[in-house]
Amino acid sequence: MSGHSKWANIKNRKAKVDEKRGRLFTKIGREIIIAARMGGGDPEGNMRLKAAIAKAKAANMPNENIQRAIMRGTGELEGAAYEEMTYEGYGPGGVAMLLNIATDNRNRTASEIRYIFSRGGGNLGESGCVAWMFNPKGVITVEVPAGDKREEVILQAIEAGAEDVDDEDDEVLEIKTAPGDLEAVREALEASGVTITHAEVEMVPQTTVTIDDPETAGKVMRLIERLEDHDDVQAVYTNADIPAAIMDQLDI
């Protein structure tokens, strides 16, 4: 087991904010559409779709919305043809940023994302400029208070194939897996009765850049927020590590 996940603090801080913005269902809907288009509409035979549906249900997305998104993906209903892309760039303090994009107009999206980067003190980079700094990993977060049950859950995760368990938080475990092992580990944890709050493949930085200046940290967070506010941005990953003490000083 390694040390604390450097991106976890930022993700946890922003989770409640994202829920309030009203864009969550739109983003998850696009995720379902793309997954169904690529692998078919049966979640039992399409692990990416299964994970997207689980994410939708965790966000309390109505079942009819989920089904419509699946049907748009399979072509049973008409809808926009979304294209997946990856954008790379740099934020304030030179931190690396990697964006998952789902767009029906790549020229519009590129122009708008470039403007957001520029306005936020960063710049949109060339393909390959920062992607090498990240690795795909299954990331699962579960609510497990300290105690005997916690140790049991850690052992279950490792036995099911987890590569790493971050247990520094007193209430939450963050578990990392190889992308192909995510579903098996998630199912093993569900069988143990714990509450899973997040489970999907993410781009995890190999190393991090500590931002211990509040002004720079604030600029990084504001840029992340503006990027996540864009409808075409499905996810934002960064190698920024903003310590909890600095995060507490930010008015974000």
From Swiss-Prot:
Broad class of where this protein is predominantly found: cytoplasm
A biological process term (GO) from this entry: regulation of DNA-templated transcription
Annotated localization: Cytoplasm
A Pfam family the protein falls into: TACO1_YebC_N
Tree of life domain: Bacteria
GO MF term list: DNA binding
Keywords: Cytoplasm, DNA-binding, Transcription, Transcription regulation
Cellular component GO terms held in the UniProt record: cytosol
Database matches in InterPro entries: Integrase-like_N, TACO1_YebC-like_2nd/3rd_dom, TACO1_YebC_N, Transcrip_reg_TACO1-like, Transcrip_reg_TACO1-like_dom3, YebC-like
Assigned protein family: Belongs to the TACO1 family.
Protein known as: Probable transcriptional regulatory protein Moth_1704
